[in-house]
Amino acid sequence: MNIVITMGGLGYRFQKAGYTVPKYQIEVKGKTLFEWSMISMDAFKKETFIFLVRKEDNATSFIENECARIGISNYKIIELDRLTKGQAETASLAIPYCDKDKPIFIYNIDTYVEAGQMTDDIIIGDGFIPCFKAEGDHWSFVKLDSNGNAIEVREKTRISDYCTIGAYYFRTAQLYQEIYDELYVKSGYLEHGEQYIAPMYNWMIQHGMNVRIQDIEPKYVHVLGTPEEVEVFKNLKN
């Protein structure tokens, strides 16, 4: 399996809050946000990881050291020399480095899901989206039919209670590339001004593919995408 970790964002909110290092290098409870995020992927440590990071972050040695400590040995680091149009484009830049016939599992760098929740034995369907239930409209949302099949996925439009955690599975890396090209490259489509991954599943659904979700209990999900969320996590009792 190809594990793609998107780290290409600017982290404006953390900069405004006074942080002077990239978001994923911030330390909370003795671990960097990078390490907390990678704990989520503990079941996949033997797979091939591809990290996409801003070149100006000079983060290669940081990632190498973190991977050595965590136990991730098979990885590539791709440095980006420009800001992308969103997570979907960032992930697409990893495709040339993937085994295109193998599945691709894309994850962000600012969510900690407790170890053991995301495992490869629960993945089903042509597409698979780990979700949890949370309040607010700032998530991607997945609507299901009565059989548990995804029938619609929307960014920042609350069509259901199932919120994505920022992890996205596609049956093959080649399939991801084909959908990305159809939805974003050929049509120039944007959702809320960006190229998000979530809407790509609508293309799959419209073309008869099966998209499923995982419903993770909220107590196992710790979102670390803003300074406020980091403070909440800091104050959680172990």
Where in this protein do the model-derived segments appear?
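A structural signal for short hydrophobic beta-strand segments in well-ordered beta-sheet cores
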Residues: 25, 141-144, 213
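Short alpha-helical oligomerization interface
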Residues: 19-24
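Conserved alpha/beta core of the MobA/IspD/sugar-nucleotide pyrophosphorylase nucleotidyltransferase superfamily
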Residues: 3, 163-238
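Conserved N-terminal catalytic core of the sugar/cofactor nucleotidyltransferase
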Residues: 2-5, 13-15, 27, 31-103
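Residue-level signal for inorganic ion chemistry
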Residues: 34, 94, 110, 142, ...
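Conserved core of the sugar-phosphate nucleotidyltransferase
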Residues: 113-191
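Short beta-strand-to-loop acidic/aromatic patch adjacent to the donor-nucleotide binding site
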Residues: 101-111
